[in-house]
């Protein structure tokens, strides 16, 4: 029986979500930064951990520079 990488408990077929090559419990597959529940294949991965594509993964690991969340980024109101 496979174990969930988040909670390390057994994952039964009825509650299984497969993502990143592993079987997860549906509520355990969450973005590491914001905690949003993710869907299989609908997210990004960094060092084996799931992240929502936008805004978390893009802000943390995407291109940096003007207008991209880096040091030179500005928000106008």
Swiss-Prot record:
KW Hydrolase (keyword) present: no
Disulfide links within the chain: none
Pfam families assigned: LIM (PF00412)
The keyword Methyltransferase is annotated on this UniProt entry: no
CDD domains: LIM_CRIP
Record-level GO BP terms: cellular response to antibiotic; cellular response to UV-B; heart development; immune response; intrinsic apoptotic signaling pathway in response to DNA damage; prostate gland stromal morphogenesis; regulation of gene expression; response to zinc ion
SUPFAM superfamilies per UniProt: Glucocorticoid receptor-like (DNA-binding domain)
Keyword terms, alphabetized: Acetylation, LIM domain, Metal-binding, Methylation, Zinc
GO molecular function, a single term: zinc ion binding
Annotated ranges, domain LIM zinc-binding: 2-63
Its biological purpose: Seems to have a role in zinc absorption and may function as an intracellular zinc transport protein.
Entry protein name: Cysteine-rich protein 1
Organism ancestry: Eukaryota, Metazoa, Chordata, Craniata, Vertebrata
The encoding gene: CRIP1
